[in-house]
């Protein structure tokens, strides 16, 4: 599923969140300006890929963690072409990191687990057409980052004094 935000929409997070909640895995953002790090930020904040297309300046493809997969520039190619693997899950690292050795032992080179140590994020990615990340999450009782935050928020709301 895809979503589209246009130009100045980059300044309103609620539109991006709404697209993600409706299942968008890639959000395209055509714009009159490049957006810079805002494009990368929208990717990691919403845990989905972003693809920008601008008349002038930099256009780019960003993965779910905000990493640029491909980009254009004033002095470079006018096309950004790069692979996006959508068979992955974005997780809060703790406590799921405790299960990573078991997952790696079972799936070996058919998966990749990347840890973003400072942010405490982890990404589990399938490298094989016969491995579905959703099945790994179910098998090892892992929650996506969104599910983890929703669970934590329900506890916060229960005990907040206001």
Locate each region found by the language model:
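A short C-terminal boundary segment appended to hydrolase-like catalytic domains
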Residues: 89-162
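Active-site beta-loop-alpha junctions enriched in small/polar residues
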Residues: 7
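CN hydrolase (nitrilase-like) catalytic-core segments centered on the catalytic cysteine
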Residues: 10-111
